[in-house]
């Protein structure tokens, strides 16, 4: 892969371990019990998620996780105009034309006019789109509006599926007593469970679980960010990006679209700095309100005594990596 500002349509994939739903419910119960005072997990039929503002009633059927682009597209201005993607094209690239897609990504600046957060929930074949975007205003406040496009920019983490109502794992937690946020707690708990069980998956270097789900912040406030417009200079990931982001306290009554993995199934050793695997982002959650102009990127809750989450989750058997921006940057460095 040479050094170029044009997009490369490369697609890689890796198998994931798919536990039985009862097993997954038990794993999540164990993962969450030390972090929240009340934890309830069960296998049940998914509620009608259109009532939560989603474009499909369920999250089941032919599930697959997708990681598109990457942070390098955000850091360097030379990619801001070229790193533009279309959800229907991504669905076709992973073999699920017309899919229901939900998750967390950046908006297209060509649609919004500025850099912004995107909360995609779109059933492509049914031509049903409930996507929202959130942007920073000139006075430093933020707003959220409907987004009438399938286009997104820079990076994204998604679940593609049929959008069917199927059995799922329902999780309800209240009153946080530990330090982890809701999503990180589940993700790290699954990683620990897999490490202890030594599960193998044919064709993968290491067994990992990938989860997609929709959850609601029923009560309490959360800490989230909204990206401002692009910087005109190259940023270094880390403190510089944290300082650039705009953080707000939002909630409750937030619908959260979440994608997370216990680890990268293409990596032999998860902590290795030489083994890049698929360069996967291990968790990404965006949220929107149905009653207020609030939306953005979820970090953690700010009111541990009052917080309550309830959500519906499913494992996916495969993760796809599309247009890997990290691999492109390594190729650029090698060409110098």
Language-model region placement:
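Compact beta-sheet-dominated globular domain cores
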Residues: 260, 270-274, 278-332
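Extended, low-hydrophobicity segments enriched in charged/polar residues
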Residues: 7-206
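Long, positively charged binding patches that form subdomain-scale interaction surfaces
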Residues: 158-279
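Histidine (H) residue identity feature
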Residues: 80, 109, 123, 142, ...
